[in-house]
């Protein structure tokens, strides 16, 4: 699953796309460690910490596109683990594709978490500083082929209620499976 590492980022302002990247990396640009848990992909870092029954994920972005756009910044997700229900172990899916019969899987790591961050988008006529604080979610995709080879299209979304979040994800694969 680590043969096709990539990072995708989309930034919208009032329903208009301001920035989109889908950066693929050579497998040797992906490194990880268990204690403390972190993954590095190129100049981007993903860290996980558990502090006082709170699960924190922090993403540190440092991206440069061929178009000269640059995105830098930090995003932190914080989840109160006392409100989390148990789910199946996602790592059990990461077997040989022949055994699991899938080429792509979606891992909804934090379906509902507090999020805060600061991003700097440079490359247009202006530099955008984007600060945010609110409610969001965080997911990962994993597969045994480049993600773009797995699907024709996909649809996803979320609805936050007072105590719950509804998240859906539908992928129309190239072999006709939904």
Kindly give the residue locations of the regions a language model identified.
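Structured soluble/peripheral alpha/beta segments that form catalytic or ligand/cofactor-binding pockets
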Residues: 1-178
């Amino acid at each position: 699953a680590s043969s096709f590492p990539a990072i995708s980022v989309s930034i919208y302002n009032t329903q208009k796309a301001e920035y989109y990247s889908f950066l693929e990396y050579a497998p040797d640009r992906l490194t990880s460690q268990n204690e403390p848990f972190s993954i590095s992909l190129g100049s981007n870092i993903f860290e996980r910490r558990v502090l006082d029954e709170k699960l924190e994920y922090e993403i540190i972005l440092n991206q440069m596109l061929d178009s000269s756009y640059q995105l830098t910044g930090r995003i932190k997700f914080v989840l109160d683990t006392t409100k989390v229900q148990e789910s199946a172990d996602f790592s059990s899916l990461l077997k040989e594709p022949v055994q699991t019969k899938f080429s792509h899987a979606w891992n909804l790591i934090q379906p509902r978490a507090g999020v805060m961050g600061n991003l700097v988008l440079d490359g247009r006529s202006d530099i955008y500083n984007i600060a945010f604080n609110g409610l969001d979610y965080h997911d990962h995709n994993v597969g045994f082929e480049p993600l773009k080879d797995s699907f024709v299209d996909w649809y996803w979304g979320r609805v936050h209620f007072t105590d719950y979040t509804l998240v859906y994800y539908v992928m129309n694969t190239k072999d006709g499976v939904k």
